[in-house]
């Protein structure tokens, strides 16, 4: 289980004037959002295994590949999600790929890019700007165009996405839909204090917490 941080909860209650229930609800939503982001990343990557025409999602290595066209893709959600070290590591990995095969094309595909683009990726290594036309920075719309031949393919996907998600969710059994029972579970642990329940869950194996009481 992802435990709620009791120290942070205490600060949030005292500093921001929130109730403990509000703080717990906000933390649960944050954790659900993090999990949802992982599912979204899975969706962006794995949709290409259903497109065919040589596109695959390998178990390891690049996120998406096309062996026939020798295209290797690293996918990121936003243009600012990689720090300098991560960017350099990714770029050097792509350099290794194009050095092994002169016909290889490596792409950093960004779901949310700064612009619609398909351009050489330029980075700084040891304060020196380097680039290669075979290592490219590509926005998601341009990548969908590259994959399907339709420059509006990504736009068309976005147009039907709400309907598709709604259909999938409505087809789920009630037991498969995420239920938020955290407050109920916490209340069962210490009916007199939600905050006490949170402390006990996190620190129950610590010395003295078997007899924990707020002053």
PLM features: residue spans?
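Hydrophobic, Leu/Ile/Phe/Ala-enriched alpha-helical segments that form helix-helix packing faces
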Residues: 47-51, 94-101, 202
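Conserved catalytic cores of phosphodiester-cleaving nucleases, focusing on short active-site segments
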Residues: 64-82
């Amino acid at each position: 289980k992802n435990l709620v941080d009791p120290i942070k909860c205490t600060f949030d209650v005292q500093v921001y004037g929130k109730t403990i229930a509000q703080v717990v609800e906000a933390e649960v939503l944050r954790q659900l959002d993090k999990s949802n982001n992982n599912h979204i990343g899975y969706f962006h990557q794995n949709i290409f295994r259903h497109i065919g025409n040589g596109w695959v999602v390998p178990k390891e290595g690049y996120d998406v590949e096309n062996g026939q066209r020798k295209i290797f893709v690293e996918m990121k959600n936003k243009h600012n999600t990689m720090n300098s070290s991560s960017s350099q590591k990714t770029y050097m990995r792509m350099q290794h790929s194009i050095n092994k095969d002169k016909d290889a094309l490596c792409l950093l595909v960004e779901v949310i890019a700064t612009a619609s683009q398909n351009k050489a990726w330029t980075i700084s290594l040891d304060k020196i700007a380097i680039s290669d036309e075979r290592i490219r920075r590509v926005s998601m719309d341009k990548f969908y165009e590259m994959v399907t031949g339709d420059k509006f393919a990504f736009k068309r996907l976005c147009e039907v996405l709400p309907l598709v998600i709604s259909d999938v969710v409505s087809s789920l059994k009630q037991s498969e839909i995420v239920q938020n029972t955290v407050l109920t579970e916490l209340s069962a642990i210490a009916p007199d204090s939600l905050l006490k329940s949170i402390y006990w869950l996190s620190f129950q194996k610590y010395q003295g917490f078997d007899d924990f009481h707020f002053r």
